[in-house]
């Protein structure tokens, strides 16, 4: 594959303060030192298809493997798209070049790019055939492991909706929601993109209605209310859920407000929109500025009484704020200039999408994102977990991760999970980095926990949990293993040795 830097990983705003000494602290693979990447010091290589959670895992990872139905839909996305936006042979031939041109407008030439670029037919075609397709893959893998609080009659809103990418991803990822009577406010500054998106969504519904019929079910397309406007525009109904995907990435680069001011404004608007027990799902590119912004919004929502449901395994200070906010007086370990983001490898993505990406010189082996899911419902379930105990021989690997259960079984599962957690007397931690080598023959992964910023370590061998765990894995670590005074000298993370 091409090594061309993907859009969401290339466009990185420089931090105001210089980075801390020791570049090996970075989470990015390309910033690792030769010592870290030396093959002689690494354990035997593990194939990408073998990198999965093992029995030590407790809880579901951030990303789920694509289900058979989801993979089929994503493989046939060009056919669904062709019903709304047919391309003749000449336009198909020009598509890779148009994608490459749009990529440069969204990155290198961003300052000169028009805000309403999706009103341009050529750019809309390039955007939907490349960015929408990739975003569907990202979102479907993420949404499979998030249990959204939606019921019959609910109103929800997706801001920066564009061609309804999030709505389409949710329809693909959550077949159990297809029978619910939901109304979605889809808000965007481009009316043409919204109209196009509604047609695309209906074409998707027609496709799943033909290929995914299940006994005793009747899929009904959700009611779409298109709203031409920006985040903050008044809506008629209070919302059970507010979502956005990549909207703020279009806003805060050119906003006169600081990130802190933008986060405060976001909190204020969210509180206007939501019902008392409403929830918020914000998804952004996996870049430092987006991670920093989401960390600030999370802090604002926690002050309003929200629970940080995912990906956070705790409701304390964010461990990855992408700034130096260590509370030295309290001794809380916080990462310096590291941000919360998660990656997945793309080998199970549609092959035609991978080929199109290569043709546009935008091939990628991995994709990433940052997100927060917060709920005002105190009973909201944080980090769904398997019903088997961590370390049990029956614990499922990531390739067979459990998907959200029907509502009728939700209470039963929560009870089992609470009992499981109590029996283990452990601390849930979320792996938030690639593999590093903090010492010879030692593997390390940075992690988030209620105890703060952690550096998990194991001996460097092929079957090490840190070598096999995927990004976003949730582990259950014995509380006795976390000694706050045992710190890494460079990063000040709490050192946690695992077997």
PLM features: residue spans?
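C-terminal lobe and adjacent flexible extensions of AdoMet/dcAdoMet transferase-like proteins
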Residues: 346, 350-499
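A short SAM/SAH-binding and catalytic strip from SAM-dependent methyltransferases
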Residues: 240-259
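Class I SAM-dependent methyltransferase Rossmann-like catalytic core
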Residues: 113-144
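A short glycine-rich, Lys/Arg-flanked "PGG" loop and its adjoining helix->strand segment in the class I
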Residues: 261-277
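N-terminal auxiliary segments of SAM/dcSAM-dependent transferases
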Residues: 3-23, 29-111
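S-adenosyl-L-methionine
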Residues: 196-235
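Conserved beta-strand signature within the Rossmann-like core of class I S-adenosyl-L-methionine
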Residues: 276-284
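Conserved SAM-binding loop of SAM-dependent methyltransferases across substrates and taxa
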Residues: 163-179
């Amino acid at each position: 594959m091409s090594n061309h830097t993907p859009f969401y990983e290339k466009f990185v705003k420089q931090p105001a303060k210089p980075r801390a000494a020791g570049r090996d602290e970075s989470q990015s693979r390309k910033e690792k030192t030769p010592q870290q990447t030396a093959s002689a010091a690494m354990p035997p290589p593990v194939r990408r298809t073998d990198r999965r959670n093992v029995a030590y895992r407790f809880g579901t990872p951030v990303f789920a493997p694509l289900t058979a139905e989801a993979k089929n839909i994503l493989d046939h996305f060009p056919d669904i798209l062709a019903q709304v936006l047919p391309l003749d042979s000449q336009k198909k031939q020009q598509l890779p070049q148009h994608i490459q041109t749009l990529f440069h407008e969204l990155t290198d030439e961003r300052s000169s790019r028009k805000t309403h670029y999706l009103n341009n037919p050529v750019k809309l075609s390039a955007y939907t055939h490349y960015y929408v397709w990739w975003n569907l893959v990202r979102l479907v893998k993420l949404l499979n492991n998030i249990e959204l609080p939606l019921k019959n009659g609910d109103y929800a809103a997706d801001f920066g909706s564009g061609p309804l990418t999030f709505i389409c991803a949710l329809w693909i990822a959550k077949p159990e929601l297809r029978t619910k009577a939901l109304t979605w406010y889809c808000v965007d500054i481009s009316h043409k993109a919204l109209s196009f998106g509604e047609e695309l969504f209906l074409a998707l519904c027609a496709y799943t209605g033909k290929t995914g019929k299940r006994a005793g079910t009747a899929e009904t397309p959700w009611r779409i209310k298109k709203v031409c406007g920006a985040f903050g525009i008044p809506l008629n109904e209070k919302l059970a859920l507010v979502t956005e995907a990549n909207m703020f990435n279009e806003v805060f680069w050119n906003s006169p407000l600081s990130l802190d001011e933008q986060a405060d404004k976001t909190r204020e608007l969210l509180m206007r929109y939501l019902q008392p027990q409403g929830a918020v799902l914000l998804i952004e590119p996996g870049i430092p500025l987006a991670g920093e912004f989401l960390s600030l919004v999370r802090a604002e929502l926690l002050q309003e009484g929200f629970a940080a449901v995912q990906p956070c395994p705790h409701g304390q200070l964010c461990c990855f704020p992408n700034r130096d906010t260590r509370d030295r007086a309290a001794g809380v370990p916080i990462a310096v200039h590291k941000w919360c983001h998660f990656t997945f490898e793309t080998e199970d993505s549609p092959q035609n999408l991978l080929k199109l990406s290569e043709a546009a010189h935008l091939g990628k082996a991995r994709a990433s994102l940052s997100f927060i899911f917060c709920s005002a419902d105190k009973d909201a379930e944080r980090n769904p977990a398997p019903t088997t105990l961590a370390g049990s021989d029956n614990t499922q690997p990531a390739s067979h991760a459990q998907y959200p259960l029907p509502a009728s079984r939700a209470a039963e599962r929560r009870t089992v999970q609470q009992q499981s957690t109590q029996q283990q007397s452990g601390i849930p931690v979320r792996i938030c980095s690639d593999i590093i080598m903090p010492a010879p023959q030692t593997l390390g992964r940075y992690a988030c926990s209620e105890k703060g910023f952690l550096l998990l370590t194991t001996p460097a061998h092929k079957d090490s949990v840190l070598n096999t765990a995927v990004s976003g894995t949730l582990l259950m670590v014995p509380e006795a293993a976390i000694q706050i005074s045992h710190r890494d000298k460079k990063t000040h993370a709490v050192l946690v040795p695992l077997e």
